[in-house]
Amino acid sequence: MDRPNILLIMTDEHAPMYSSTYGHPLLQTPYMDQLAQEGATFDNAYCNSPLCLPSRMSFMTGRYINQIGAYDNASPLPSDTVTWAHMLRAVGYDVTLSGKQHFCGPDQLHGFNTQLARDLHAELWTKNGMLRGTADWSKGTPAAAKPWGGVAEAGPGTTTEIEVDDLVEERSIEYLRDPTCKEKPWVLNASFIAPHFPLIVPERYFDLYPLDQIDMPEIPEGHLENQHPVHQRMRSMFGAADFPEEQ
Protein backbone atom coordinates (compact mmCIF):
# COMPACT_ATOMS: atom_id res chain seq x y z
CA MET A 1 0.00 0.00 0.00
CA ASP A 2 1.32 3.44 -0.93
CA ARG A 3 2.01 5.74 1.98
CA PRO A 4 -0.54 8.59 2.00
CA ASN A 5 0.42 12.24 1.98
CA ILE A 6 -0.76 14.11 5.09
CA LEU A 7 -1.90 17.74 5.31
CA LEU A 8 -2.38 18.76 8.95
CA ILE A 9 -4.15 22.12 9.34
CA MET A 10 -4.17 23.67 12.82
CA THR A 11 -5.88 26.76 14.21
CA ASP A 12 -5.16 28.20 17.66
CA GLU A 13 -7.60 28.57 20.56
CA HIS A 14 -10.46 27.58 18.29
CA ALA A 15 -13.28 26.08 20.33
CA PRO A 16 -15.44 23.75 18.20
CA MET A 17 -18.72 25.41 19.15
CA TYR A 18 -17.54 28.55 17.33
CA SER A 19 -18.02 27.06 13.88
CA SER A 20 -20.94 26.27 11.63
CA THR A 21 -19.55 22.72 11.51
CA TYR A 22 -20.64 22.20 15.11
CA GLY A 23 -23.91 24.07 14.77
CA HIS A 24 -23.22 27.73 15.61
CA PRO A 25 -26.22 29.68 14.22
CA LEU A 26 -24.24 32.74 13.11
CA LEU A 27 -20.62 31.85 12.38
CA GLN A 28 -19.70 30.75 8.87
CA THR A 29 -16.88 28.21 8.45
CA PRO A 30 -17.60 26.72 5.00
CA TYR A 31 -14.22 25.06 4.47
CA MET A 32 -14.38 23.35 7.84
CA ASP A 33 -17.89 22.22 6.89
CA GLN A 34 -16.58 20.75 3.64
CA LEU A 35 -13.75 18.90 5.38
CA ALA A 36 -16.23 17.49 7.90
CA GLN A 37 -18.69 16.40 5.21
CA GLU A 38 -15.97 14.63 3.22
CA GLY A 39 -14.24 13.12 6.24
CA ALA A 40 -14.94 12.49 9.91
CA THR A 41 -15.63 14.65 12.95
CA PHE A 42 -14.99 13.84 16.60
CA ASP A 43 -17.16 14.88 19.51
CA ASN A 44 -15.07 13.47 22.36
CA ALA A 45 -11.53 14.66 21.74
CA TYR A 46 -9.69 16.54 24.48
CA CYS A 47 -6.34 18.28 24.79
CA ASN A 48 -4.08 17.27 27.68
CA SER A 49 -3.53 20.75 29.08
CA PRO A 50 -5.42 24.06 29.08
CA LEU A 51 -2.15 25.90 28.36
CA CYS A 52 -0.82 26.46 24.85
CA LEU A 53 2.70 25.01 24.94
CA PRO A 54 2.05 21.98 27.18
CA SER A 55 -0.95 21.02 25.05
CA ARG A 56 1.09 21.23 21.85
CA MET A 57 4.04 19.31 23.30
CA SER A 58 1.70 16.53 24.42
CA PHE A 59 0.24 16.49 20.91
CA MET A 60 3.70 16.37 19.30
CA THR A 61 4.99 13.56 21.52
CA GLY A 62 1.90 11.53 22.36
CA ARG A 63 2.85 11.76 26.04
CA TYR A 64 1.30 13.35 29.12
CA ILE A 65 2.72 16.71 30.18
CA ASN A 66 4.09 15.30 33.44
CA GLN A 67 6.14 12.81 31.41
CA ILE A 68 7.87 15.55 29.40
CA GLY A 69 8.02 18.31 32.02
CA ALA A 70 5.81 20.71 30.05
CA TYR A 71 3.92 22.60 32.74
CA ASP A 72 3.83 26.16 31.39
CA ASN A 73 4.46 28.25 28.28
CA ALA A 74 8.18 28.53 29.08
CA SER A 75 9.03 24.81 29.11
CA PRO A 76 11.43 23.86 26.29
CA LEU A 77 10.98 20.36 24.92
CA PRO A 78 14.32 18.49 25.13
CA SER A 79 15.76 17.99 21.65
CA ASP A 80 16.21 14.27 22.24
CA THR A 81 12.49 13.79 22.92
CA VAL A 82 10.93 11.82 20.06
CA THR A 83 8.00 13.46 18.25
CA TRP A 84 5.74 12.16 15.51
CA ALA A 85 7.80 14.33 13.12
CA HIS A 86 10.89 12.26 13.97
CA MET A 87 8.97 9.02 13.51
CA LEU A 88 7.56 9.96 10.11
CA ARG A 89 10.96 11.13 8.87
CA ALA A 90 12.39 7.78 9.92
CA VAL A 91 10.04 5.96 7.54
CA GLY A 92 10.83 8.20 4.57
CA TYR A 93 8.45 11.15 4.80
CA ASP A 94 9.38 14.74 4.03
CA VAL A 95 8.03 16.43 7.18
CA THR A 96 7.50 20.18 6.88
CA LEU A 97 6.18 22.82 9.28
CA SER A 98 4.62 26.05 8.09
CA GLY A 99 3.84 28.48 10.91
CA LYS A 100 3.31 28.08 14.63
CA GLN A 101 4.04 25.02 16.75
CA HIS A 102 5.06 27.01 19.86
CA PHE A 103 8.47 25.39 20.26
CA CYS A 104 10.53 27.39 22.74
CA GLY A 105 14.28 27.36 23.07
CA PRO A 106 16.95 26.95 20.38
CA ASP A 107 15.43 23.85 18.71
CA GLN A 108 12.65 25.09 16.45
CA LEU A 109 12.20 21.91 14.39
CA HIS A 110 11.94 18.90 16.74
CA GLY A 111 11.92 16.43 13.86
CA PHE A 112 10.59 18.60 11.05
CA ASN A 113 12.87 18.88 8.01
CA THR A 114 12.23 22.58 7.63
CA GLN A 115 9.96 25.47 8.61
CA LEU A 116 8.45 27.46 5.74
CA ALA A 117 6.97 30.41 7.66
CA ARG A 118 8.00 31.97 10.94
CA ASP A 119 6.61 31.28 14.39
CA LEU A 120 6.19 34.58 16.25
CA HIS A 121 6.58 32.83 19.60
CA ALA A 122 10.12 31.80 18.70
CA GLU A 123 11.02 35.50 18.65
CA LEU A 124 10.05 35.88 22.32
CA TRP A 125 13.19 34.02 23.40
CA THR A 126 16.48 35.66 24.30
CA LYS A 127 19.86 34.30 23.19
CA ASN A 128 20.45 32.73 26.62
CA GLY A 129 17.22 30.76 26.41
CA MET A 130 14.98 32.94 28.60
CA LEU A 131 11.43 33.91 27.71
CA ARG A 132 11.06 37.67 27.31
CA GLY A 133 8.65 39.22 29.80
CA THR A 134 8.42 36.15 32.04
CA ALA A 135 6.82 37.13 35.34
CA ASP A 136 8.53 36.26 38.63
CA TRP A 137 5.57 35.14 40.75
CA SER A 138 7.82 34.47 43.77
CA LYS A 139 7.87 38.23 44.33
CA GLY A 140 4.09 38.49 44.49
CA THR A 141 1.50 39.18 41.83
CA PRO A 142 3.18 41.09 38.98
CA ALA A 143 1.51 44.32 37.91
CA ALA A 144 0.74 45.09 34.28
CA ALA A 145 2.37 48.20 32.85
CA LYS A 146 -0.95 48.86 31.12
CA PRO A 147 -4.28 47.02 30.93
CA TRP A 148 -4.35 44.08 28.55
CA GLY A 149 -6.17 45.02 25.35
CA GLY A 150 -8.17 41.84 24.85
CA VAL A 151 -11.78 42.54 23.94
CA ALA A 152 -11.26 46.30 24.28
CA GLU A 153 -9.09 46.32 21.14
CA ALA A 154 -11.28 43.91 19.18
CA GLY A 155 -12.42 45.04 15.77
CA PRO A 156 -11.48 45.24 12.10
CA GLY A 157 -7.89 45.87 11.09
CA THR A 158 -4.59 44.13 10.55
CA THR A 159 -1.85 42.85 12.82
CA THR A 160 1.53 41.17 12.57
CA GLU A 161 -0.25 37.91 13.43
CA ILE A 162 -2.55 38.27 10.41
CA GLU A 163 0.43 38.98 8.16
CA VAL A 164 2.21 35.88 9.47
CA ASP A 165 -0.89 33.73 8.90
CA ASP A 166 -1.10 35.03 5.32
CA LEU A 167 2.53 33.96 4.87
CA VAL A 168 1.78 30.52 6.33
CA GLU A 169 -0.99 30.10 3.75
CA GLU A 170 1.16 31.38 0.88
CA ARG A 171 4.17 29.19 1.69
CA SER A 172 1.98 26.13 2.27
CA ILE A 173 0.32 26.48 -1.14
CA GLU A 174 3.73 26.96 -2.79
CA TYR A 175 4.92 23.75 -1.14
CA LEU A 176 1.89 21.76 -2.26
CA ARG A 177 2.25 23.00 -5.85
CA ASP A 178 5.96 22.21 -6.01
CA PRO A 179 6.51 19.26 -8.39
CA THR A 180 9.21 17.87 -6.08
CA CYS A 181 6.43 17.03 -3.60
CA LYS A 182 5.67 14.02 -5.77
CA GLU A 183 9.15 12.55 -5.28
CA LYS A 184 8.45 11.12 -1.81
CA PRO A 185 5.53 10.99 0.64
CA TRP A 186 5.10 14.21 2.58
CA VAL A 187 3.55 15.65 5.71
CA LEU A 188 2.77 19.36 5.82
CA ASN A 189 1.73 20.90 9.14
CA ALA A 190 0.13 24.25 8.23
CA SER A 191 -0.39 25.90 11.60
CA PHE A 192 -2.15 29.26 11.99
CA ILE A 193 -2.29 31.74 14.89
CA ALA A 194 -5.94 32.76 14.34
CA PRO A 195 -8.37 32.94 16.06
CA HIS A 196 -5.95 33.43 18.98
CA PHE A 197 -5.86 37.02 20.26
CA PRO A 198 -5.36 39.83 19.34
CA LEU A 199 -9.07 39.79 18.48
CA ILE A 200 -8.61 41.75 15.26
CA VAL A 201 -9.65 40.50 11.82
CA PRO A 202 -9.70 41.91 8.29
CA GLU A 203 -12.73 44.14 7.75
CA ARG A 204 -14.34 41.80 5.18
CA TYR A 205 -14.69 39.15 7.88
CA PHE A 206 -15.64 41.52 10.69
CA ASP A 207 -18.51 42.86 8.57
CA LEU A 208 -20.02 39.38 8.23
CA TYR A 209 -21.28 39.57 11.80
CA PRO A 210 -23.42 42.59 12.79
CA LEU A 211 -22.80 43.41 16.43
CA ASP A 212 -26.53 43.50 17.21
CA GLN A 213 -26.79 39.81 16.22
CA ILE A 214 -24.10 38.63 18.62
CA ASP A 215 -25.29 37.34 21.99
CA MET A 216 -23.40 38.47 25.07
CA PRO A 217 -22.26 35.77 27.49
CA GLU A 218 -24.35 35.23 30.60
CA ILE A 219 -22.38 36.22 33.71
CA PRO A 220 -23.81 34.92 37.00
CA GLU A 221 -24.38 37.22 39.95
CA GLY A 222 -21.29 37.49 42.14
CA HIS A 223 -19.02 36.04 39.45
CA LEU A 224 -16.06 38.32 40.18
CA GLU A 225 -16.39 38.16 43.94
CA ASN A 226 -16.45 34.35 43.91
CA GLN A 227 -13.54 33.80 41.54
CA HIS A 228 -10.77 31.43 42.55
CA PRO A 229 -7.75 33.31 43.98
CA VAL A 230 -5.64 32.23 41.00
CA HIS A 231 -8.11 33.87 38.61
CA GLN A 232 -8.12 37.02 40.75
CA ARG A 233 -4.33 37.21 40.56
CA MET A 234 -4.44 36.71 36.80
CA ARG A 235 -6.93 39.58 36.48
CA SER A 236 -4.58 41.75 38.48
CA MET A 237 -1.55 40.71 36.42
CA PHE A 238 -3.30 41.63 33.17
CA GLY A 239 -4.46 44.95 34.58
CA ALA A 240 -8.11 43.93 34.22
CA ALA A 241 -9.14 44.21 37.88
CA ASP A 242 -10.13 47.86 37.50
CA PHE A 243 -12.07 47.55 34.25
CA PRO A 244 -15.49 49.24 34.50
CA GLU A 245 -18.44 46.85 34.56
CA GLU A 246 -19.45 47.55 30.95
CA GLN A 247 -16.08 46.20 29.78
Indicate residue ranges for each PLM-predicted region.
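Formylglycine-dependent sulfatase
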Residues: M1-Q247
